[in-house]
């Protein structure tokens, strides 16, 4: 029984390693070429794996695409959201969240910049499970930014009449514009412009308490 269990555990771990290897490659491909650039055969060839083995792990191109989206969401959360899990609500935290996003894009965690910006343009006018998964990831991020603004407002860092949905829309637009310009033209200045615009937007709606937090963040940086 113990030998059988050890053998099974070994196979499971090898399967998990192969899955991580495949998804690492598919995330990079999709960020540059789109999710339609993925296929079981291509991945098997590029990674020198058996096509039957890749098929056993994913079963179809659509499942490979969906798994890639889920993996990318985990990478995004690890780089952008997780570093702030212990940070108190406030204007300083909102700006740090935006800075994390700009760093995630500018440091090319994915080869094509922001994974979700790239695949959203590919699937925004389509229907089906892949479109729905992309839309859900985008919605979750927007909702998270809105909630961060709302929590900062409740903490007294922003004016009581702050429109959190509008504020989130504006800072996300600046971040995505920086990503698009940098990826297209291969330059980094767009990220500096985006950060200046975001900071100006936050300061325009910040209370004295919020301004103090933003100023303290500048000194810490």
Regions found by a protein language model. Give the residues of each.
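Hydrophobic alpha-helical segments that form the core
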Residues: 112, 117, 160-181, 197-200
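Hydrophobic alpha-helical connector segments
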Residues: 67, 81-112, 164-171
């Amino acid at each position: 029984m113990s030998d059988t269990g050890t053998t099974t555990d070994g196979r499971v771990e090898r399967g998990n390693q192969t899955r991580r290897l495949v998804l690492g490659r598919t995330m990079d491909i999709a960020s540059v070429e789109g999710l339609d650039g993925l296929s079981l055969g291509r991945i098997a060839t590029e990674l020198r794996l058996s096509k039957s083995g890749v098929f056993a792990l994913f079963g179809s191109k659509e499942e490979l695409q969906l798994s890639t989206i889920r993996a990318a969401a985990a990478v995004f959360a690890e780089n952008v959201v997780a570093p702030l899990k212990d940070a108190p609500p406030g204007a300083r935290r909102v700006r740090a969240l935006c800075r994390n996003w700009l760093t995630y894009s500018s440091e090319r965690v994915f080869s094509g910049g922001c994974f979700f910006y790239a695949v959203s343009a590919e699937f925004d006018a389509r229907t089906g499970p892949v479109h729905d998964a992309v839309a859900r990831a985008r919605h979750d991020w927007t909702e998270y930014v809105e909630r961060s603004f709302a929590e900062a407002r409740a903490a007294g860092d922003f004016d009581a009449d702050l429109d959190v949905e509008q504020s989130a829309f504006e800072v996300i637009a600046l971040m995505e514009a920086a990503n698009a310009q940098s990826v297209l033209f291969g330059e980094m200045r767009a990220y500096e412009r985006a950060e200046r615009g975001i900071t100006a937007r936050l300061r325009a709606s910040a209370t004295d308490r919020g301004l103090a937090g933003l100023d303290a963040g500048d000194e810490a940086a």
